[in-house]
Every structure is written in structure tokens, then in C-alpha cells.
Amino acid sequence: MFNNFLNMYMCTLAEKLCKFKKNNFNNIHRNNNFYRDNNFYRDNNFYRDNNFYRDNNFYRDNNLYTNNNLYRDNNFYRDNNFYRDNNFYRDNNLYTNNNLYRDNNLYTNNNLYRDNNFYNITLRKFHFIQTISNNNFNFEIIKKYGDVINKIMFIHTQKKNKQERFMFNNKKYIKRKEYILNDLNEFISIIPHPEINNEITNNSNQKKNKDNKQNVLSTNQQIITNYNLNHKENVTSNLNFNNKEEDEKKLDKLLKKRNIKKRDIVTITEEAKEELKKIISINKKENNNNYNNMNTICSDNHNDMNTICNDKNILKLFFITKGCNGLTHSFNFISKKDIHKEDEIIYDDQNNILLVIDKNCILYVINTTLDYYKDDLTEKFIFKNPNITSICPCGTSFHFSKKK
């Protein structure tokens, strides 16, 4: 009994399990279909949306492309029309301007031609001129206006009186006149008359004055050039003479400047000059005595005598370092060979060398006066040098400040 009950329970349990599995399978299948349907619907929507979006973009792009092309075509068409219209306008203006210019020229030429004819007709109408031949003119007039006289039309009239007369505008009779054409195509009487020729001559003179001014300038230039060419020799001779006079004046001035005595760097008083001459003469005597003595000693060897017996008779001024303040003036005898080219030389009245100043002392001795003092106790040379800045108490040495 228990077994039967157990089998029955197991069968029912098995049926329930089968139903449950079946339901689960159906649910799974149904769910799969639902998911698939949802995906399909969603995919369709996505595809449709994408197509719609793409179609919209394509439509928009096409519209943009067409609009751009249309805008470009419109611009091109507009530009072409504008360019064409401008060209047409310009061509029309050019055509109208050319026509206007041509018409104006034609109009002015016609007016000018008409006015000239009217002028000639009035002259013929109011001036009855007797026919004349070339023999009635002077030779000079025929020479100048021979070509023009042949072009003049003369009208012959006879009056009751045997005298030949001409009728004027105001119906007055005046004496016979002879007319010719001038360079400006105007009638001018050969015999001047104020009533006829004043107006014509005034107009012609105003036009000729401008030409005359230019001709006067050109003729003046030609006269000057011709004068210079014809009188070239006279002009050059005058210039050379003037140049010689100026050169002589310049030479005189230069010679006067050279003749002016150059001021020495050191001014020597008369007492100092006499004392320097005495010292130089004493030195020469001593040198001569020494020379005579050396002749007896150096008679056999002349080279030794020449080296020992050099003539040192020139007095030279220089500075030496001595004393408590630095420098002192000093003199020494040298020969002419020892004079340096940059040394300063002072001459006496007879152009003999009186004193030579060393090249290193020149800057410090400028404007110095050399004097000589002598009394019963002392005799000495005194230097009054403005360049010295300090002197020692004993007066033997001095000092210069450094120049900046």
C-alpha cells in the first residue's frame, strides 16, 4: 500500500515537473520571440531613423549644393551682366564722346570756316580796292609778300571823278589804299591810316609782342656769343692781364710776411747777447790753442787729430736734473754735426748761430726771456720763465706742473 502511494506520488510529481518544464520552455520561447521582435522593431526603427537622417542630410546637402551652385551661377551671371553693362556703358560713352568730339570739331571748323568767309566777304563788301600789279609795290614789299600778293582779290571801280576813291563803312570817301595779307591772314594797308589800321594793328601787335620778347632774348644770347667768339682774344688777354696783377699782389703779400722777422721762442736781451758772444769767442780761442798744440802731438796721425780736434763752438741750452726742486738750466758747447733737425736755432744780427735750444726743452721755454745780471759780487744769467710753477729757495732749481 505504501508502495502504491509512493508510486502515485512520484507520478504526480513527475507530471508536475513535466508541466513546469513545459511552461518554462514555453515562457523561454515566448520571451525569445519577444526579445527578437523587440530587437527587430528597434532595428527597423534605427534603420529607418538612420535612413531618414541620412535622407535628410542628403536632401540638405543636395539643397546646399544646388543653392551654392545657384548662388554661384547667379553671381557669375550678375558679374557677367555687370561687366557687360559696364563695357556697354563705357563703349557707349566712348562712342558718344568720340561723336561729340567729332561733332564739336566739325562745328568749330564750320564756324571757323564760316567766320573767315564772312570776314573776307565783309572786307570785299566794304572795301573796294583797285586792281594793281606787282609793279606798284616797292621791291622790299614784293620780296617779303610776293607769294601773298598773288592771292589777294582786288575789285576795280570807277567813279565820276577822275580821282580814284574807296568807300568806307560810314559811306565816306577816303583816299586810295593798298592792302596786303600779313602772316596772320589779316589785311593791312601799306600806307598806314588810323581809321582803318588801328584795330587791325592793335590785335596783331598784341600777338607779335610775345614772339618779339622771345626773339629779343634769343638775339641777345646770339649777340653775346658772337661777341665772345669775335673778341675771344681780347677777352683772354684782359683776363690774363688781370690774373697777372692779382698774382703779383699775392706775391708781394707773401714776401712781406716772409720778411717779417720771426719771433724767437726765447727773447734774449742785449746784455745777454753780448755775454753769449764773449763766451763763444773765448771758446773759439781755446779751441784754436788746443788745435795748435795737437798739431805738434798728432803730426804723424791725422785721423786721431780730426777725432780729437772737432770744432765745438756752438752754445746749446738744455735741462738737467739738479737741485732740491728737480731741474736747472744748463749750457754746453756742441759742433754743427750735433745739431738735431728738431732743435730750435736762434741767430744774431749777422746770421751767426747764437744759441741752440734742445728739442726736449722747447715746450717748457716758450715766452722765456734770457737776461744777464752783473755786479761787484756776482754775475749770472737770469731766466724769466712763465711756465715754471715752483722754484727752490736758493733759486738754482725749478719745477714744471704736468700738463693735462
Swiss-Prot record:
The keyword Lipid metabolism does not apply. One of its GO terms (molecular function) is 2 iron, 2 sulfur cluster binding. GO terms for cellular component: cytoplasm; mitochondrion. GO terms for biological process: iron-sulfur cluster assembly. It is found in: Mitochondrion. Keywords: 4Fe-4S, Coiled coil, Iron, Iron-sulfur, Metal-binding, Mitochondrion. Pfam families: Fe-S_biosyn (PF01521). Pathway: Cofactor biosynthesis; iron-sulfur cluster biosynthesis. SUPFAM superfamilies: HesB-like domain. Residues 244-289 form a coiled coil. The keyword Iron applies. Transmembrane segments: none annotated. Participates in iron-sulfur cluster formation (ISC) pathway for iron-sulfur (Fe-S) cluster biogenesis. Can bind and transfer [4Fe-4S] clusters to target apo-proteins. NCBIfam families: iron-sulfur cluster assembly accessory protein (TIGR00049). Belongs to the HesB/IscA family. Dimer. Homotetramer. Interacts with ABCB6. This is Iron-sulfur assembly protein IscA2. The lineage of its organism: Eukaryota, Sar, Alveolata, Apicomplexa, Aconoidasida. The gene is IscA2.
